């Protein structure tokens, strides 16, 4: 999850990069309480590139989703920007890996991932026996790549002044 949704390159044992890393510098500015129009404008920006949008999904933190659930879609209707885990007809996926004040949008058919080669699963009851713990280690070769960069967009929410 961290590789797919982070806006910074994950370091360590991988060279994989998710779709939002290259979008940080060109992120669309959203207000502290993003409006329905702001969400729809970002959606239109992705759809205008020719992406059909059948697999579009919003990515944000639970805190950002809570703000959208409390933001009215328009004055007086009582309808909120995020209702039933959807914004502008698209599902909302929450993860802290996207980072606070970031909202991602992507058509995930253009971010394939797979496991390659042999998979080894090691059960190690000895290394941490003094701690009464058993280590479970799964070793796999994992890969992912962004097929169409235009299928993804990133918005940066302006933090509310205190």
What are these model-predicted stretches?
Residues 1-45, 156-162:
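Alpha-helical scaffold segments that mediate packing/assembly in large oligomeric complexes
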Residues 1-23, 48-59, 63, 92, ...:
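Long, contiguous amphipathic alpha-helices that act as assembly "spine/axial" helices in icosahedral shell
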Residues 29, 33-106:
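Charged, gly/pro-rich, cysteine-poor intrinsically disordered low-complexity regions
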Residues 72-162:
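Sequence/fold signature of self-assembling virion shell proteins
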């Amino acid at each position: 999850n961290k590789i797919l949704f982070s806006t910074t390159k994950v370091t360590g044992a991988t060279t994989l990069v998710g779709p939002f890393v290259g979008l940080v510098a060109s992120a669309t500015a959203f207000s502290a309480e993003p409006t329905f129009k702001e969400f729809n404008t970002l959606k239109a920006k992705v759809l205008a590139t020719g992406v059909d949008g059948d697999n579009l999904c919003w990515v944000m933190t639970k805190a950002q989703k809570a703000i959208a659930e409390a933001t009215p879609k328009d004055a007086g209707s009582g309808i909120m920007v995020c209702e039933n885990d959807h914004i502008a007809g698209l599902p909302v996926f929450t993860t802290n890996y996207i980072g606070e004040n970031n909202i991602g949008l992507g058509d995930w058919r253009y971010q394939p991932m797979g496991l390659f080669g042999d998979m080894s699963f090691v059960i190690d009851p000895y290394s941490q026996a003094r701690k009464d713990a058993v280590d479970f280690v799964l070793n796999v070769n994992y890969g992912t790549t962004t097929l169409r960069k235009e299928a993804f967009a990133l918005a940066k929410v302006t933090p509310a002044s205190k």
